[in-house]
Amino acid sequence: MRATAIVLLLALTLATMFSIECAKQTKQMVDCSHYKKLPPGQQRFCHHMYDPICGSDGKTYKNDCFFCSKVKKTDGTLKFVHFGKC
């Protein structure tokens, strides 16, 4: 009984550690692949939920929509630095 409890506790601990690592990995980059480059003069309408992203140009973007729009506009020269303010 005691050995079963220890094995179960160990399995639960490992599962928790792996799920935390997976959650960290999913939010280490911004995926701009689903944003298309717009024709000249056309604007993208982005939601205004604040989830800041720091770009390689030293600017803080409100969220992934604003950041990815700029990435597409610059043909990929703008790079992701980190989540949060610059």
Curated annotation (Swiss-Prot):
Disulfide bonds: C32-C68, C46-C65, C54-C86
Location in the cell: Secreted
UniProt keyword Zinc-finger present: no
Tissue-specificity statement: Skin. Highly expressed at sites of hyperkeratosis. Also detected in thymus, tonsils, testis, pancreas, liver, placenta and brain. Expressed at stratum granulosum and stratum corneum at palmar and plantar sites (at protein level).
The organism's place on the tree of life at top rank: Eukaryota
One GO location term (cellular component): extracellular region
Membrane-crossing segments per the record: none
Signal peptide location: 1-19
InterPro entries attached to this UniProt entry: Kazal-type_SerProtInhib (IPR050159), Kazal_dom (IPR002350), Kazal_dom_sf (IPR036058), Prot_inh_Kazal-m (IPR001239)
Pfam families registered for this protein in UniProt: Kazal_1 (PF00050)
Subunit structure: Dimer. Interacts with KLK5 and KLK8.
Annotated protein name in UniProt: Serine protease inhibitor Kazal-type 9
Species whose genome carries this gene: Homo sapiens
